[in-house]
């Protein structure tokens, strides 16, 4: 236990350093100590628990959510933007801008970027703004397309991203769903389809939209040949809560709805997990459950989301943690 005199010296040095902003050399000069001793006493004070730093920056609650998401789910990065009063276009545009900035910070020439469909991916592509040329980057769809809807037209999204990056873009000329498993097997074995999916399998970066299978709020039904009844069946029979690349998973992130998965012209969840860096992009309270399942399944290395979704995800974690303890 330090003596009163030593504790008083600790307090003086800590006040000068943290409260008045003096450098260690100026503190040493004022107190007649060596700079090395001041440094040593500061370190010792931290070890003794005399220093309690509280950070109160604007939007601190968002940064705290990011920290907790990373700690709870073991992801490398989390970016949480404010939820807007207009939960539609304003949030989507802000989310796309944040995701595009994060993506560009990590993009390296020579990367193969695989993308899924969705409004958040479309917003991210639209927000890409760079003067740098990524001529060695390749952009590839990991799922078939539905023509006529920009956010679900994989070939449009890949081409648009390629143009913005000055990168090579591939197109996958196949539907999202085949009529039957046999038809799906036949399509996936076609050279022009197989070659594109093989490139996607060798991607080292993935941009992933995270969708809900709730037919009342999901755009997934609009993107695919599945009906609202199909979605209800998946949710009720196998406990599906979300989808990535049209592949449905339950609350623990386990794949489900195999009879539908067999018809998908795209990567499987297991194949997506082999991509070295996977960025999930999704927002709104309705996406909390799908995001939670995706994080539980280990499908994401990074998450770009909004406050409403982040709070919902952490509430789900707390509820499940209490239930299991």
Give the residues covered by each predicted segment.
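Conserved beta-strand segments of alpha/beta enzyme cores
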Residues: 76-79, 138, 168-170, 247
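Conserved phosphate- and dinucleotide-binding cores of soluble alpha/beta proteins
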Residues: 2-14, 18-19, 23-26, 32, ...
